[in-house]
């Protein structure tokens, strides 16, 4: 089941924002890892066109708003269910190590752990990108794409000023920083000056910047679900982020219920006179 959010764009148009699948976000992440921001934009653009029939009627601010909304509603919301911060998805060390011991496969996995404290770890984030089907989709998207390069100053400005998680600021940010004027010669079909908002390399980067760090952690979350809960990878790819997190949360709730039941049974056994006599020797 694909969930959707009913969204009103800055221009007042309404649409149903259907979730992308996990495999779609992984393909987007591959473009970002290669710093191919135009490829990222074109892939995201094609995915949104499929789910929003009137996409081509939207202006650039509405489109950019939708790009960020996909991130905001699917990735940010999913990660925040169990982790308020974006710096990591955390799990207890003992649980993770037990899971890794059961699932370790030297042919495809290369584990490298970074211990933060006594009970938290981070885990690798380059495992799943080797999936063959995803590679085919990714490389086919590269054929007609040429990369745009930004200056160091442009990158610095965007990284310091882009409204990463605030949809309310996005319209002003795009309007103020990325508007361009197109002047068409008056003798061409009698058209006078045209003013429009154009998509340029800086806009590719600003949208990509919003996705990049959180997609890395979202990728780690996929790894956690796949190997901790032991969901088949093919099934996980076809899920959406919300479906994945529902599965994960149900698993956690079941685990907690089992632990409480085990703890309760252990307490009851200690109150058993026979058990007490045995303990006293």
Name every feature range the model reports, one short phrase each:
Residues 263-281:
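Short acidic DE-rich linear segments
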Residues 1-264, 281:
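An amphipathic, hydrophobic-aromatic interaction surface with interspersed Lys/Arg
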């Amino acid at each position: 089941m694909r969930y959707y959010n009913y969204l009103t764009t800055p221009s007042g148009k309404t649409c149903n924002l259907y979730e992308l699948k996990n495999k779609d976000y992984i393909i987007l992440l591959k473009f970002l890892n290669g710093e191919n921001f135009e490829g990222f934009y074109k892939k995201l653009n094609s995915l949104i066109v499929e789910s929003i029939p009137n996409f081509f009627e939207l202006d650039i601010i509405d489109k950019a708003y939708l790009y960020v909304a996909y991130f905001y509603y699917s990735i940010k919301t999913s990660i925040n269910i169990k982790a308020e911060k974006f710096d990591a998805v955390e799990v207890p060390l003992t649980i993770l190590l037990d899971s890794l011991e059961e699932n370790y496969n030297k042919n495809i996995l290369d584990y490298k752990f970074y211990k933060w404290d006594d009970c938290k770890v981070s885990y690798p984030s380059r495992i799943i990108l080797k999936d063959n089907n995803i590679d085919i989709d990714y490389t086919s998207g590269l054929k007609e794409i040429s990369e745009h390069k930004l200056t160091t100053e442009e990158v610095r400005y965007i990284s310091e000023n882009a409204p990463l998680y605030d949809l309310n600021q996005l319209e002003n940010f795009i309007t103020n920083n990325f508007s361009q004027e197109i002047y068409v010669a008056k003798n061409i079909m009698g058209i006078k000056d045209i003013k429009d908002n154009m998509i340029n390399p800086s806009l590719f980067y600003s949208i990509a910047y919003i996705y990049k760090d959180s997609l890395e952690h979202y990728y780690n979350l996929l790894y956690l679900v796949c190997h901790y809960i032991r969901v088949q990878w093919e099934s996980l790819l076809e899920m959406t982020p919300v479906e994945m997190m529902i599965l994960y949360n149900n698993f956690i709730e079941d685990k907690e219920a089992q632990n409480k039941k085990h703890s309760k049974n252990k307490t009851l056994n200690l109150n058993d006179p026979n058990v007490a006599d045995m303990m006293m020797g």
